[in-house]
């Protein structure tokens, strides 16, 4: 094992996560229909600051992400600063790492803290699948540019006459990989077939996720980390995730048809995460700054790792690649963990990664490691459910997982937790957290 790389400042301070918050997560075109991601981000950051009672000028940086970006607000981070009453001099920039975007935001704030350029910052992400940048065809886009430069009405009419009716149809955002044309669900189908994951196994994991999430809400475990929201016309509160199906049975899952490979597939809408709207954020600072402000941190960021693999086959294996690296940098093994939380993009993807984490052959032949990362104990795995149940607003999921894991570690008396996710483009992310 290589030497551990502790995340500390030049003064030896640990990187503290003092609080975290998220909106409830809403299925596409439901509670947050018509609410853009930038407004969801303002909601959560404004409420996070109000609850923390931290002086507004104590936050020196805000790093925020959005995967489905809107052209009118390309720097969502700066718009959040300007829209929440934060100090206008607060540095703010936006990041994007697909489904691992808020992992990246957290890493960036941590690096600023370690460099000593700031002592406190906010990291997070927001996405809306209900407010989308609906585009136009390439043919229409080109004509519109040319029309803007045309000098006469006749020239403009000539340009428009070149268009066909199909060129006028709106173009929704792409749901496929730019480089391969494969949809995420196509990759999940690849993984199910490669690793022999059955429909029954996928449905069982999805059912488990919903049952655990419903139980977490019923026991009040999420109340402190999920805010109540009000949206126009501001009459009814929206306070709980609306995708969770606590009353579902395994028989219900079996009724659905495959969503991607219609003839021979096993990936369905029920064993996949749904399109979702929501936002999440965390406040981070140096350990000494937290003490100065009289704050007890939720926990600490011990290590992180980002990885990348090829996109043509089984590209959602990011957790199997990034987890051993994050553990190594933390100076830990799988056995040292109290909790292990993996983003459930698809049940097939989740089960494939769990299989490979325990595979000696994968460790030796693919990762070049002497031994497997380790089997994940079911008693430690996604104990409060995962993304299949909660939903997945792309840029917000990492911050949700971090906050949720730290709260659960605190309830268990402390320990180490690892959160990990796959992401489009063959990317992976993992972070080791510590709570006392």
From Swiss-Prot:
Enzyme Commission code(s) on record: 2.3.1.16
Protein localization: Cytoplasm
Catalytic machinery residues: 99 (acyl-thioester intermediate), 392 (proton acceptor), 422 (proton acceptor)
PROSITE patterns xrefs: THIOLASE_1, THIOLASE_2, THIOLASE_3
Domain of life of the source: Bacteria
Main location: cytoplasm
Protein name as catalogued: 3-ketoacyl-CoA thiolase
Organism: Salmonella agona (strain SL483)
Gene name of the record: fadI
């Amino acid at each position: 094992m290589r030497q551990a790389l502790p995340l500390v400042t030049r003064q030896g301070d640990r990187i503290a996560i003092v609080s975290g918050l998220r909106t409830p997560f809403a299925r596409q075109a439901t509670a947050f229909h018509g609410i853009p991601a930038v407004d969801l981000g303002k909601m959560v950051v404004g409420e996070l600051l109000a609850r923390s009672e931290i002086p507004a000028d104590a936050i020196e940086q805000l790093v925020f992400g959005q995967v489905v970006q809107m052209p009118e607000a390309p720097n969502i981070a700066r718009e959040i600063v300007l829209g929440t009453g934060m100090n206008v001099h607060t540095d703010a920039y936006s990041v994007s790492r697909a489904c691992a975007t808020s992992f990246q935001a957290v890493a960036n704030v941590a690096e600023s803290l370690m460099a000593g350029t700031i002592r406190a910052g906010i990291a997070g992400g927001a996405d809306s699948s209900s407010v989308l940048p609906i585009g136009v065809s390439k043919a229409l886009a080109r004509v519109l540019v040319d029309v803007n430069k045309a000098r006469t009405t006749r020239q403009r009419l000539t340009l428009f006459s070149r268009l066909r009716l199909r060129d006028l149809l709106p173009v929704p955002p792409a749901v496929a990989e730019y480089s391969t044309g494969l949809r995420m669900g196509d990759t999940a189908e690849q993984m199910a077939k490669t690793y022999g994951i059955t429909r029954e196994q996928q449905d069982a994991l999805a059912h488990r996720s919903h049952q655990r999430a419903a139980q977490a809400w019923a026991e009040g475990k999420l109340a402190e980390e999920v805010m109540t929201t009000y949206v126009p016309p501001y009459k009814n509160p929206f306070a709980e995730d609306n995708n969770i199906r606590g009353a579902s049975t395994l028989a219900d899952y079996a009724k659905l048809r495959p969503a991607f490979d219609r003839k021979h597939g096993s990936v369905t809408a029920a064993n996949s995460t749904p399109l979702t709207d929501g936002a999440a954020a965390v406040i981070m600072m140096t350990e000494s700054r937290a003490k100065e402000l009289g704050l007890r941190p939720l926990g600490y960021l011990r290590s992180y790792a980002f990885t990348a693999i090829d996109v043509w086959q089984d590209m959602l294996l990011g957790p199997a690649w990034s987890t051993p690296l994050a553990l190594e940098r933390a100076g830990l093994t799988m056995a040292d963990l109290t909790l292990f939380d993996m983003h459930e993009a698809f049940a097939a993807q989740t089960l494939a990664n769990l299989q490979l984490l325990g595979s000696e052959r994968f460790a030796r032949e693919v990762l070049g490691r002497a031994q497997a990362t380790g089997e994940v104990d079911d008693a430690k795995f996604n104990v409060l459910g995962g993304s299949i149940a909660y939903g997945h607003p792309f840029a917000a999921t990492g911050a949700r997982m971090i906050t949720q894991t730290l709260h659960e570690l605190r309830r268990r008396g402390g320990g180490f937790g690892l959160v990990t996710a796959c992401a489009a483009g063959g990317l992976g992310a993992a972070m080791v957290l510590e709570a006392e």
